[in-house]
C-alpha cells in the first residue's frame, strides 16, 4: 500500500472528469508498485505473483462489474464499492500487456513515456494515444479503446516482464460463474 501511494507522486493524468484517466493513475500505481520492487531485487517473483493475484483477482478478474466502461464505473463507484476498484486492475493489466506488446515489437517500453511526465508536467490522453499510435499503430489504438469500453483484457504471456505464467481460474460471484485469471512465478 505504501509503495502504491508513493507511486502516485510521479505518474499523473488529469482525471477531473472522473473515469477518463482513473485507469492510468491507479493502473500505474498498481503496476509500478509491483514491478519496481521486483526489478530492483527487493521482492521475489513468488511474492509478486501473490501481489498480482490480489491486485488483479478481486479488483478486476473476479469483479462482476469488470465489463463496465470506464465512464460507467465512474457513475456507479459511489453506489457500489466494487466499481471503484476495477480501474486499478484494468489499468494494471492494460499497462502490463501494452508493455509486453511494445517490447515484442522492439519499441520503447511504457517506462519511456511514463517517466517523461510527472505531477508538474502531466501526461494527457492525447499524449498517450500518440505514443500508442506511433509504436503499436491502429491495432494498439483499438486495444486502448476496448480497454476504455470495458472489454475483458486477457493477460499477455509476456506481461510483467514475462516472469509469470497466467492460467484460467473459475470463480463464482453473485451466483455467476466467471472465467478469471491467476498467475504463478515461472
What is the role of each PLM region?
Residues 1, 19-23, 85-93, 104, ...:
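Soluble non-cytosolic domains of exported or imported proteins
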Residues 37-49, 102-110, 135-143:
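Structural helix-adjacent loops and short alpha-helical linkers that scaffold large soluble proteins
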Residues 38-42, 60-62, 119-126, 154:
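Secretory-pathway/luminal and periplasmic proteins that interact with or process carbohydrate-rich
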Residues 26, 30-33, 109-122:
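Acidic helix/loop microenvironments that form the catalytic cleft of cell-wall polysaccharide enzymes
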Residues 1-61:
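Zinc-dependent metallopeptidase catalytic helix centered on the HExxH motif
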